[in-house]
């Protein structure tokens, strides 16, 4: 293609691999792929390559896996490729200023939110957690800050009432490559525009923790239902009963208020296990006891009905 760019791609998980896949058929020249070192995974803790490495090797692309880009000898790996631009998608390593400045057109990043909202590690999950009605992807020119660079392209996406982090991840994994290719086309043609982020609109998407996934019945049912969707597929919301954790994969909000303390079981049948909250009732419909697969409320009641006697407290 005319205006073909020499591109370094840097990314690690499946989300990044979908962007590399789009680049492979774009006509641009991929001169190198950076991804995190192989990690132990699975029951045998066998060293496992990242999805980006697997795809890159299938297409015989040079792969680099430094543990850090701070040492000068690792920075030379980038410089020696003489790239026009570096595309960074969920790479997981910090790029020092020296590296950001090496490609002729700098480095661009695909971020899973409409910046400046939700800078940081968990933008997809936090948009659900906060009850946002819209999210999207932002392509930005990278600088040394945390997602602070100038914005070059945005694509918005509605958040549906039944979206989970898994479903939203899939939507953004389709939008991201579109935005990336559009931005690269504009950069190649010299028509790319840059918009400074409005610092007054910044919010931060803190990393998720397993502790945060514990359901706090002193919150409103609406907020707890958002947590269930935001923490699916990880770390998965849960409560404990008889000192055993029970994960909650799906839940709905019942608008009526219960005349009971938060955490009290109101009713349990095939339609769900109803629990009182600070405001409204949370109806648990898909659950997973320790050591079992996710199951319907009915299946759990068949084996553990004594746990969910109305009046019991979770």
Swiss-Prot record:
Pfam families assigned to the protein according to its UniProt record, in alphabetical order: Formyl_trans_C (PF02911), Formyl_trans_N (PF00551)
UniProt-listed InterPro entries: Fmt (IPR005794), Formyl_trans_C (IPR005793), Formyl_trans_C_sf (IPR037022), Formyl_transf_N (IPR002376), Formyl_transf_N_sf (IPR036477), Formyl_transferase-like_C_sf (IPR011034), Met-tRNA-FMT_C (IPR044135), Met-tRNA-FMT_N (IPR041711)
EC number(s) on file: 2.1.2.9
Protein keywords: Protein biosynthesis, Transferase
Keyword match rRNA-binding: no
Binding site for (6S)-5,6,7,8-tetrahydrofolate: 113-116
Catalysed reactions, semicolon-separated: L-methionyl-tRNA(fMet) + (6R)-10-formyltetrahydrofolate = N-formyl-L-methionyl-tRNA(fMet) + (6S)-5,6,7,8-tetrahydrofolate + H(+)
CDD domains in the record: FMT_core_Met-tRNA-FMT_N, Met_tRNA_FMT_C
A GO term from the CC aspect: cytosol
GO terms of molecular function: methionyl-tRNA formyltransferase activity
Family: Belongs to the Fmt family.
Function statement: Attaches a formyl group to the free amino group of methionyl-tRNA(fMet). The formyl group appears to play a dual role in the initiator identity of N-formylmethionyl-tRNA by promoting its recognition by IF2 and preventing the misappropriation of this tRNA by the elongation apparatus.
Name the record gives this protein: Methionyl-tRNA formyltransferase
Source species: Serratia proteamaculans (strain 568)
């Amino acid at each position: 293609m005319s205006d073909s760019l020499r591109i370094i791609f840097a990314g690690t998980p499946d989300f990044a691999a979908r962007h590399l896949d789009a680049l492979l058929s774009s006509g641009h020249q991929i001169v190198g792929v950076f991804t995190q070192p192989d990690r132990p995974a699975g029951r045998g803790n066998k060293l496992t390559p990242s999805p980006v490495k697997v795809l890159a090797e299938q297409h015989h692309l040079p792969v680099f896996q430094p543990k850090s880009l701070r040492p000068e000898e690792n920075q030379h790996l980038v410089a020696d490729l003489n790239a026009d631009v570096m595309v960074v998608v969920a790479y997981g390593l910090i790029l020092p200023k020296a590296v950001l400045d090496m490609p002729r057109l700098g480095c661009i990043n695909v971020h899973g939110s409409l910046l400046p909202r939700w800078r940081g590690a968990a933008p997809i999950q936090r948009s659900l957690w906060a009850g946002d009605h819209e999210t999207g992807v932002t392509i930005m020119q990278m600088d040394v800050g945390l997602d602070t660079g100038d914005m070059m392209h945005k694509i918005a996406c509605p958040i549906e009432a039944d979206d989970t982090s898994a479903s939203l991840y899939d939507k953004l994994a389709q939008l991201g490559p579109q935005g990336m290719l559009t931005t690269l086309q504009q950069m190649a043609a010299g028509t790319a525009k840059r918009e400074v982020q409005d610092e007054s609109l910044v919010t931060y998407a803190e990393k998720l923790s397993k502790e945060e996934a514990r359901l706090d019945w002193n919150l409103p049912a609406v907020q707890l239902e958002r947590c269930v969707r935001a923490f699916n597929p990880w770390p998965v919301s849960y409560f404990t009963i008889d000192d055993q954790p029970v994960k909650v994969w799906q839940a709905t909000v019942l608008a009526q208020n219960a005349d009971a303390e938060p955490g009290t079981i109101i009713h349990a049948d095939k339609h769900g296990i109803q629990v009182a909250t600070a405001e409204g009732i949370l109806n648990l419909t898909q659950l997973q006891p320790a050591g079992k697969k996710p199951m319907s409320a009915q299946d759990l009641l068949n084996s553990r009905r004594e746990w969910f006697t109305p009046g019991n407290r979770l």
